[in-house]
């Protein structure tokens, strides 16, 4: 992953790098790989995430429709 440093502005380049890494899910991946996760724990986590996403989508849909 590359970020251009313009006018020796390292702070701005770091900010851009962090934004790119966040968008691509690098931080999330690092957090998940920090410790070994058993396959059964992984399935349970993914199922819980899917349920959370479905609830969020339903909430947004109801909010748009005005219920």
From Swiss-Prot:
Keywords: Ribonucleoprotein, Ribosomal protein. One of its GO terms (molecular function) is structural constituent of ribosome. The keyword Transcription does not apply. Gene3D superfamilies: Ribosomal protein S8 (1.20.5.1150). The keyword Chloroplast does not apply. One of its GO terms (biological process) is translation. One of its GO terms (cellular component) is ribosome. Belongs to the bacterial ribosomal protein bS21 family. NCBIfam families: S21p (TIGR00030). This is Small ribosomal subunit protein bS21.
């Amino acid at each position: 992953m590359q970020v251009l440093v313009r006018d020796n502005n390292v702070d701005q380049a770091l900010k851009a790098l962090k934004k790119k890494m966040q968008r691509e899910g690098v931080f999330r991946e690092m957090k998940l790989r920090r410790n070994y996760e058993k396959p059964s724990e992984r399935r349970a986590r993914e199922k819980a995430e899917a349920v959370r996403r479905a609830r969020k989508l339903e909430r947004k849909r109801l909010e748009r429709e005005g219920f």
